[in-house]
Amino acid sequence: MHEGVQVSSKLEQLQDLLAPVVVALGYQCWGIDFSSQGKHSVLRIYIDKEGGVLVDDCAIVSRQISGVLDVEDPISTEYTLEVSSPGMERPLFTIEQFASYAGEQVKIKLRSPFEGRRNFQGLLRGVEEQDVVVQVEDHEFLLPIDMIDKANIIPTFD
């Protein structure tokens, strides 16, 4: 999904440009994801607010973000803009988000193998500095956050 430093700096640029727009509209910018599949790319912006996000909220943010993107033109290729709530399978982007969801089940995919594997599914134990602590069966892994390509909460229904 991500192609190393180039995509990482592109994400930082998009975050710096778009997060203030989302916040100014009264929403939390939960995270931004930019993925390329061949000739087509997708820019996903996850928004959140107290009480949840409705379709109308996504439309409001999408219109404002589209205007900023049209003026600033930070993406040189063709892309689709998607604005949504993080949903039940909430993606995790920051060390603070990982810390706040300690105790939840997570699915994590790394950019490159760590201890012989790229995929981890288990209990999110918390964070230690810039490492995410995940327990998979009887083994605990400290995964450097900068190695994480994608992470999501696995919803449980009690």
From Swiss-Prot:
CDD domains xrefs: YlxS_C (cd01734)
Q: What is its main location?
A: cytoplasm
| One GO cellular component term | cytosol
Q: Which InterPro entries match?
A: Ribosome_maturation_RimP (IPR003728), RimP_C (IPR028998), RimP_C_sf (IPR036847), RimP_N (IPR028989), RimP_N_sf (IPR035956)
Q: Does the keyword Cytoplasm apply?
A: yes
Alphabetical keyword list: Cytoplasm, Ribosome biogenesis
The compartments listed are: Cytoplasm
Q: Return one Gene Ontology term, BP aspect.
A: translation
Cytoplasm as UniProt keyword: yes
Superkingdom of the organism of origin? Bacteria
User: What does the function comment of this entry state?
Assistant: Required for maturation of 30S ribosomal subunits.
The entry assigns this protein to a family as follows: Belongs to the RimP family.
**What's the protein here called?**
Ribosome maturation factor RimP
